[in-house]
Regions:
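Positively charged, amphipathic and often flexible ligand-engagement surfaces
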Residues: 1-307
Length: 307
C-alpha cells in the first residue's frame, strides 16, 4: 500500500512543484541525488571513480512539454560526454526519451539521441549511451529506437537498453536485444503497471530477474546487473562461478546513495561496479520512485533529515 502511495505521489504535479521548491525537500533529495549542477555531478563521479567504481550520469527530467526543453537537456548531455572525455572519467550517460522530447515530437527525440550516440561513438575512448526505460506506454517505442540506433554504422556497442524484470514481456525483449548484440541493464522496475502488463508479486518479479540474469550472463555480451537485493546478487555470482563466467565480463550496478557498503564490498571481492548518479533540479519523481522501491529508505530519510 505504501509503495502504491509513493508511486502515486511521484506522478502528482502539485506535490512535485511544492517539494522541488522547498528546502526540506532539497535536503531529502541529497541522499540519492548528487546535486543540481553538472559540476556537482562530475565531482561525485570523480569521487566514485576513486573508489574503483564506474559511473552512469543521469540529468534528471522526463515528459518535457516543448522542443526547447528537449534541446536544452540534450545540450547538457553533450557537455557531460565532453567533460567525461576531458577529465578521463570512467563514466557513461543514461537518457530518458521523454526528456529528449518523445511526447512532443518523436522525430526530434530520435535526432537528439542520435546526436548523443554519435558524440559518444566519436570519443577517445568511445563512450556509451544507455537509453533508460520508462513506463509501459513507452516500452515499444524505446526499444524500437535502441534497435534502430544500434543498426546504424559505427553505433554497435555505443547504445544500450534497459529491461525491467516485472514486465511480462521482458524475456521476449531480452531475446531480441541479445540477438542484435545490444547491451542491457537489467532492473526490477519502479512504475505502477496493471497485472496484465507486469507481475504484481515480488516472488514473480524476483524469479524473472534471476531467469533474465542467467540469459544475460550466458550471452557473452557485456551487461549490467542492476540491483541492491543481496539474493539477486548472490544468484548472479553463483551462476557466474558455476558457468566460469569471468568477473570482467559483466558489471553490477547500484544507485547513488544506496548500499554504499555493499558496493565497496563487491569491488573488494573483484566484481565490477557502476554507480548510477542522478543530478538536476527535477529530482522529485526520481526520489519518490526510489522510496517506493524500498520504503525503508523513507524511514532513513526521516531520521536523518533534521540532523
Amino acid at each position: 500500500m505504501l509503495r502504491a502511495l509513493l508511486i502515486h505521489l511521484s506522478e502528482n504535479r502539485p506535490m512535485r512543484a511544492m517539494a522541488e521548491r522547498s528546502i526540506v525537500g532539497l535536503r531529502m533529495s541529497r541522499r540519492f541525488v548528487a546535486g543540481t549542477t553538472v559540476e556537482e555531478a562530475l565531482a561525485a563521479a570523480q569521487a566514485v571513480n576513486r573508489l574503483g567504481m564506474g559511473v552512469s550520469l543521469d540529468n534528471l527530467g522526463e515528459n518535457v512539454t516543448n522542443a526547447e526543453e528537449a534541446r536544452q537537456s540534450a545540450q547538457v548531455y553533450q557537455r557531460l560526454l565532453h567533460e567525461i572525455e576531458e577529465r578521463k572519467l570512467q563514466a557513461n550517460v543514461s537518457v530518458k526519451l521523454t526528456h529528449m522530447g518523445l511526447d512532443v515530437d518523436e522525430k526530434l527525440a530520435r535526432e537528439l539521441v542520435s546526436g548523443l550516440v554519435a558524440k559518444a561513438g566519436n570519443g577517445h575512448p568511445r563512450n556509451f549511451v544507455r537509453v533508460d526505460m520508462e513506463g509501459s506506454p513507452y516500452t515499444q517505442r524505446t526499444l524500437d529506437l535502441v534497435h534502430e540506433l544500434h543498426r546504424q554504422p559505427g553505433n554497435a556497442g555505443v547504445v544500450g537498453a534497459v529491461i525491467q524484470s516485472y514486465m511480462r514481456r521482458g524475456e521476449q525483449d531480452v531475446e531480441k536485444l541479445l540477438a542484435a548484440g545490444i547491451r542491457i541493464r537489467l532492473c526490477k522496475g519502479a512504475y505502477k503497471e496493471p497485472p496484465e502488463i507486469a507481475y504484481q508479486k515480488k516472488s514473480e518479479v524476483d524469479a524473472n530477474y534471476v531467469k533474465l540474469t542467467k540469459m544475460l550472463l550466458k550471452s557473452g555480451i557485456y551487461h549490467g546487473i542492476a540491483t541492491h537485493d543481496p539474493r539477486m546478487i548472490e544468484a548472479a555470482i553463483a551462476f557466474a562461478r558455476q558457468e566460469r563466467i569471468p568477473p570482467q565480463s559483466f558489471e553490477f550496478q547500484m544507485l547513488y546513495g544506496i548500499r554504499r557498503d555493499l558496493q565497496q564490498k563487491l569491488v573488494r571481492e573483484g566484481w565490477r561496479m557502476r554507480v548510477y548518479i542522478p543530478f538536476g533540479t527535477e529530482w522529485y519523481p526520481y526520489l519518490m520512485r526510489r522510496l517506493a522501491e524500498r520504503p525503508a529508505n523513507l524511514l532513513f530519510l526521516m531520521k536523518n533529515i533534521f540532523r
